């Protein structure tokens, strides 16, 4: 956020708070500290590990309906191979920690620029541990690191924003929404063009790399309403008033099954498309992270040379 003042000196406090909170997260995922609820690390030690073994054979998980991710997700799942001296889950948690630290570094670096402040870094330091140990037991934080890098790069380089956004979208889809906020005009054309070209190139590379790069698209069609989705709020409330549905593990996620679930899923999908259309239509000059500064009007006479 631009404030028009000198950059704030943060001192050691963000680093200290980050170290303490991340030590707690690591203690949770390594089971030094017991947290109430299901064991979220199973997703890494069992599901991710099984995908890892399949990917090492030179193919995407063609027969596993729990594989619901774009082809770039293979890079995240295979990343623990960078640390072969540790077991899979340990290496994964350490790499997530590294990505967490990278985001903090990027936000603190951005906060040191003239006219900026470190509020974003503090939100990151405090907000991530509030998500609990689940945040270290998913590869979403790796995707977030790419998205944050894209936003910060886009302040001056919309093409860099486009390239990083395309890479992030092939990891887990949602970073493509960053393109919605780019200012109309030259920044939009630069960001969207670079994103399209990069996405096409990467998609082709993944398709040539291993068979089944886009098999996940067929696995998506039968998915229902996941319990953590916004549409599921209807059923969370309905259960308190006698709704006869239930929760089941289907297609790799906990979903609601029962009366009206298909209707709500269809409505949620339609509303999501409508919301995306509204965002694309309403993105304006004030919404851009890479909008050029307006030029000052010259005071000289319009006919002077």
Predicted regions and their residues:
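Transmembrane-helix signature of polytopic, membrane-embedded enzymes
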Residues: 107-128, 288-296
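Short acidic/glycine- and proline-prone juxtamembrane loop motifs at membrane-interface regions
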Residues: 134-143
